[in-house]
Amino acid sequence: MAVPGETRPEAAPVRNEFALERYRYILQQIHTVNENAYRFLALYQTLATALVSAALALFVGYRKWDLAPATARGGVIGLLALVTVVAAFTSTLIVVGALNWLDYRNEECDITDEVVGPGFRTRPRPGNFLRWYETYLLLFILVSVIAMWLIAAFFLLPAMR
C-alpha cells in the first residue's frame, strides 16, 4: 500500500497520459479563445452596421414620415446609445477572452515545466499587450464609437431642425 503523496512507479505513465490530455485540452481552449475574439468582432460589426443604418434612415426619412425633429434626434441618440452598449459588451467579452488566454497559457507553462522541464515554454507577459490583436480590436471599437458620436453631434443632429 502506498503512502499518500508517494508516487508509485506504475503511476508515472498514467500521470503523463493525464498531463498530455490536459495539455491537449488547454491548447484547444486557447484556440477557441482566439477564434472567439473574431466572433465577437463580427457581432459588433453586424449590430453596429444595422443600428447606424437605422439612424441614417431616420435622419434621411424623418421629414417624409412626418416625425418631429426632436423625436428624430432622440431616435438617432437612442440608436447610437445602443451601438455604445453593444460596443461595451463586445469589449468586455474581448477583455475576458484575453484574461482567459493568459490563464490557459500559464497553465500550459505549468504543465510543460513539470513534464518537459522548466523554461520549455516562456510565460506570457501582459506587458506585451501591444503585440496582441485584441488590443487593436478594442482600439477599433473605441475609435468607431467615438467617430459615430462625433459625426452625429457635428453633422446629423444639427441638420435635424
Feature locations, PLM:
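Loop-to-transmembrane boundary segments
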Residues: 34, 120-146
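Membrane-interfacial hairpin junctions
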Residues: 57-74, 159-161
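Inner-leaflet juxtamembrane helices
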Residues: 36, 40, 65-122
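Juxtamembrane boundary at the C-terminal end of a transmembrane helix
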Residues: 147-161
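Short, non-transmembrane cytosolic segments of multipass membrane proteins
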Residues: 1-14, 95-105
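Solvent-exposed, non-transmembrane helices and loops of integral membrane proteins
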Residues: 8-17, 21, 105-132
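Helical transmembrane-bundle signal
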Residues: 49-52, 83-94, 144-149
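Cytosol/matrix-facing amphipathic helices and coiled-coil assembly/linker segments
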Residues: 3-65, 86
